[in-house]
Amino acid sequence: MKYLILSLLLLMSNQCEEKKEIPMQKQTTKAPFLWEAANVYFLLTDRFYNGNPNNDTNFGRTKKTAVLRGFEGGDIIGITKKIEEGYFNDLGINAIWFTPVVEQIHGSVDEGTGSTYGFHGYWAKDWTSLDPNFGTMKDLKKLVDTAHKNGIRIVLDGVINHTGPVTEQDPVWPKDWVRTGPTCTYKDYETTTACTLVENLPDILTESGKEVDIPVALANKWKAEGRYELEMKELDDFFARTGYPRTPTNYIIKWLTDYIVEFGIDGYRADTVKHTHPEVWLAFKKECDAAFVQWKQKNPDLVLDDNSFYLVGEVYGYGASNGLWYDFNDKKVNYFENGFNSLINFEFKYNAKENYESL
């Protein structure tokens, strides 16, 4: 009997050993990308990372500047290198917004902070070319492609409101393109839109419906660079396709949307939005959407998702508590009805100082 019991115990023991726990496999589903939930990293291109020290000085920009008012070396290659190193992925970033990289004025100015070059990117000289301090078109393509391979969207910064300041090296644009005064006083709609932000910052006549020619200085620049015929043909094609008049605004819309067609950037942050008429941005968004569709059709293997082009605006002073509207005192404007997916909430800098209970 005792041998029978021992045999049963051994049998049960062997059966227990044979039963192995099957590990539970976690089922993970990748969440779709939503702009409303994006983790956006903003950076000042010149101040982020110097990926190519060989492009740090161009156009004779060797004049001594005030402290931190000159180019410090950050560039497009530097951003790409940090993407490749996993810096952004480690932070959980899925969108990068960086300051403008178009060609800046060659001279320096003093707006009250000492001698300054256009290191920040908001003083455009030529919207059709990149500033060599920031990099080349090839560099930008690699950045966008690398970002997309890492699940990161790219938001460029676009300026339509103004050119760069006037210097000895950078002549003022023609009178049918810009106004040079008065300076904005921000009392109402007119004194916010039909004016210059500051002294010596020519304001594009974004409200103008008058057809204009390319500025002579810009045409001569293109000729010297050997690309005049190409640029003019592209302009002819754009205006023939859209039927738009050749106004200052429409030229710049064409130039900015070229970066979507060429590289497949995912969004624009629009600068100084409230200083132009809102209709400008509705037209801009329409062309951005068309350009994004065109890029997706030409590059089906590179498309990340079915999101449309994203446009966020800098309406300085706008706060989320105002709802859809920005108040000019004599007029309210709903920018969400004029092309924008979202606006920067300037109220947040004050909210951040409040305690949790008061929010």
Where do the model's predicted regions map?
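Sec-dependent signal peptide recognition
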Residues: 1-7
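C-terminal motif of bacterial Sec signal peptides marking the signal peptidase cleavage site
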Residues: 12-15
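Active-site-proximal helices and loops of the catalytic beta/alpha 8
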Residues: 254-359
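N-terminal structural segment of carbohydrate-active enzymes
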Residues: 18-153, 161-163, 171
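Aromatic- and acidic-residue-enriched segments that line the glycan-binding/catalytic groove
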Residues: 57-61, 104-124, 160-221, 286, ...
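Short, acidic/polar
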Residues: 73-87, 243-262
